[in-house]
């Protein structure tokens, strides 16, 4: 426990919170252009080919973003919207591409959790 004199001399240091998605620059989403669309493999216990894209953002950053859902229509020069949110088994992937906005099509034949995948309500 510091004395009052010690606190006057050296005040307590404020704890600075480090952001988990610096490329967004405190915005909820950011627009960007795909520079490369490819698949990558996850960390140790899991096995798959995860779809990811390298995206150059309007904030000047170039980040790796995950493409959620089954099937996608993205290619180089596609304009996409990204949000924060990491993929636990892909190191370095800290952003998600938002389906159903700009050049990204929604997931076809999606019936549950449609809003998360940009899918329209199916005809009854």
Swiss-Prot record:
Keywords: Antibiotic resistance, Methylation, Ribonucleoprotein, Ribosomal protein, RNA-binding, rRNA-binding, tRNA-binding
Modified residues (3-methylthioaspartic acid): 89
Gene Ontology CC annotations of this record: small ribosomal subunit
A Pfam family that the UniProt record links to this protein: Ribosom_S12_S23
Single GO term (MF): structural constituent of ribosome
Keyword rRNA-binding: yes
Chain intervals with Basic residues compositional bias: 113-124
Matches recorded under InterPro entries: NA-bd_OB-fold, Ribosomal_uS12, Ribosomal_uS12_bac
GO biological process, one term: translation
Region of interest (Disordered), residue spans: 105-124
Source organism, top-level taxon: Bacteria
NCBIfam families named in the record: rpsL_bact
Entry similarity comment: Belongs to the universal ribosomal protein uS12 family.
Any further remark recorded for this protein: The streptomycin sensitive allele is dominant to the resistant allele.
Functional summary from the UniProt entry: With S4 and S5 plays an important role in translational accuracy.
Subunit structure: Part of the 30S ribosomal subunit. Contacts proteins S8 and S17. May interact with IF1 in the 30S initiation complex.
Protein name, as recorded: Small ribosomal subunit protein uS12
Taxonomic source organism: Synechococcus elongatus (strain ATCC 33912 / PCC 7942 / FACHB-805)
Gene name as annotated: rpsL
